[in-house]
Amino acid sequence: MSMLNDIKIAYKFGGMEQKLIFWNVGAFLVSVVVWYQFRLGVFLFPTEVKLLADFSHLAYHPWTLLTYGFFHASFFHLLFNLMVLNFAGKLFQTFFTQKQLLGVYLLGLILSGLGFVLAFRFLDFGLSSGLVGASGAIMAVLVATATYAPQMNIRLLLIGQVQLWQFTLVILGIDLLQLFTENTGGHVAHLSGALFGFVYIKLLQQGTDLSKIISGFFDTLAQLFGPKKKNAFKKVHRTYQKPAPKPAMKVVIKDKTQQQIDDILDKISQSGYDSLSADEKEFLFKAGK
């Protein structure tokens, strides 16, 4: 099976965190082709993509509250963010749905961007060349999970077992210590995303799910632009004939195939797509056609 088919299966049957990883990697590859200056060794993102600390610019480029989060300043910037996203996203989906993860991620992206713009508007942080990166959104997911299940045990390489609140507190502490040293705008965005993650869980525990803002928006788009459902009731005149009994073997085979698909999907949800064997990946690809 080709690598392309392998990627298609991973995207189709993976969790929301995997889809977000694919989106970020795809955007990074585009940015390398379009905006990377190989002689200088840096990206020169246009103002139509990155987020500027300027309300007047934001008023005419509101989409940058989303686009900035899907581009990264370097490969290692992307790699670290996606490692944390994969880790935090899986933990989040232990308790919540994929729709909620997408909602927290995108709202965290928007609000961390607004925090960045507000900080440079009302606080004297000097000049900023703009903001890119998904760190604020990822911090929202991580802090939301830590707020909901602070005592959850996680195992870290070279460190061992710690509780989720301890790991999250260290990450937040690093941002606070670096707030006035370097990349001030980035750290403000991280902390803004973290604050949203905390507020999201507190409101959720009181019965208000802010992620429905995002899921409701996408549901509305699907209703407006999705395929129209055909009328389920259609008057048909036909001569009645007693249907011939269907072979039992066909039903058994269908049930067996569906059971095998369900078993593979359960394996993906528990251990990830990479845990599948080559035969299982091939079977899933053929079944998905």
Region roles according to the model:
Residues 4-8, 85-94, 149-155:
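C-terminal ends of transmembrane helices
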Residues 13-132, 179-189:
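N-terminal TM1-TM2 helical hairpin plus the immediately adjacent luminal interfacial "cap"
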Residues 127-148, 162-164:
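Membrane-interface micro-motifs in multi-pass membrane enzymes
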Residues 79, 134-142, 188-195:
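Membrane-embedded alpha-helical segments of multi-pass membrane proteins
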Residues 89, 144-148, 197-205:
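Hydrophobic transmembrane alpha-helices
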Residues 106-108, 159-163, 167-172, 190-193:
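Central hydrophobic cores of alpha-helical transmembrane segments
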